[in-house]
Amino acid sequence: DYEVRTGEEAVAPGETLTFNVTKYAVSDSSITNPAEMPEVTVDDAEYVAGNTANITVNLPSYSKVGVYTYEIKENKGQSAGVTYDATPIYLTVLVTRDEATNALKVTQYGFKKGVAGDKVDVGSGAAFTNSYVTGDLEIKKQVTGNMGDTTDKYFEFTVTLTGEDGKTYAGSYAITGGSYAENPESIVFNGTTGTATIYLKHGDTVTVQDLPDGMNYQVVEDDYSGEQYTTTVNGESGRDSGTITSDFASELTVTGEKATVSFVNDKTDENIDTGVYLDNLPYIIVFAGVLAAVAVLVIRRRRVD
């Protein structure tokens, strides 16, 4: 079984689950060494995304009465974002002799989670529960300042996803939101990396959905300092070191929570030279009005003469 954490829309990836069986203990039998116990096998389980995988345990033929206990462990898989159940289950098989036929038979069997754990109802409960953890990457854009373009200008971003070595990933991750019509609908993931270019303007938010736990991401905005924009990322200077790199980037790791990267581009100019001093503007306007009035009077007098 799979427990999915974070987004309600997230679906655990399909994979083949494998198991390891160990002869654990034997009692009430002429067999005293567990290594001499008959072998139990567990078939591989095909887990289909969004469903529950059924596990088939194959019991052997027994030649001795006794109580046989086997340890069954799930082998750790490679699906990104999945935490595999490390607690084994213990199968106990009771073999008795039929007094009427003298034949051996399996009288009872049962499962426990852990050595001293609770009984597992294989008919309705899950013997193994794996956790699939995802998080969304949210990218926001704001433009501030008296000269900032808050209506039409789109800013270019490059989003790069990098996976962990040895892990398997989905072929793509959906991109939603934003107002730019040509933004891609997903980031195509090729092996361990994927890159997409998106455009955001003031007030836009784009979300890359259901990134598996442990996925690294980098969000880089183009350099707009030539247009007199000053960039900050999550409140820090776009040129600081650390998680914010010198190329206006935010680099972090998905940890099963929504990660928000907020880019703010500020363009402020307090010294705009228009050739007019605002402190004198009312007087200049009044003076221009006086000149206009004089001109009208002069023209009228000439016409009368």
Give the predicted meaning of each segment.
Residues 1-305:
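Solvent-exposed loop/turn and edge beta-strand elements of beta-rich ligand-binding domains
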